[in-house]
Amino acid sequence: MHEMSFAEAIIRNVLRFAEEKQAKTVTSVRVRVGELLLINPEQLQFCFSVASKGTIAEGAKLEISVERADIRCLLCGRELSKDEMLCECGGFAQVKGGKDFILESVVVEV
């Protein structure tokens, strides 16, 4: 379950930010996850709650938005699905989006 390593990374960064702001509590965290990372949002929610236990982020709301993959044929420009790496025209796919994992915002109480 690679969701736990992502949850731990979120918590590390959130706690670093909260410490810089001298926060007492973290109330919410928002992340954007690329669909090509194959992260299950429900599992990430669970792992976040486990990883945040005993920290000032315990009980914080985790908002997850999934970024759709942007995959296009290099020859004809047709949009392809994440399961297509070769277009009907014979062109190969170029992946431009859906691979990122971004911590978008952290809300804290000082």
Curated annotation (Swiss-Prot):
Residues bound to Ni(2+): 2
Biological processes annotated in GO: protein maturation; protein modification process
Lineage: superkingdom: Archaea
Cited Pfam families: HypA
Positions annotated to bind Zn(2+): 73, 76, 87, 89
One GO MF term attached to the UniProt entry: nickel cation binding
Keyword Transport annotated: no
Keyword Zinc: yes
Key words, A-Z: Metal-binding, Nickel, Zinc
Matches recorded under NCBIfam families: hypA
Similarity comment: Belongs to the HypA/HybF family.
Role summary: Involved in the maturation of [NiFe] hydrogenases. Required for nickel insertion into the metal center of the hydrogenase.
Name of the protein: Hydrogenase maturation factor HypA
Species assigned in the record: Archaeoglobus fulgidus (strain ATCC 49558 / DSM 4304 / JCM 9628 / NBRC 100126 / VC-16)
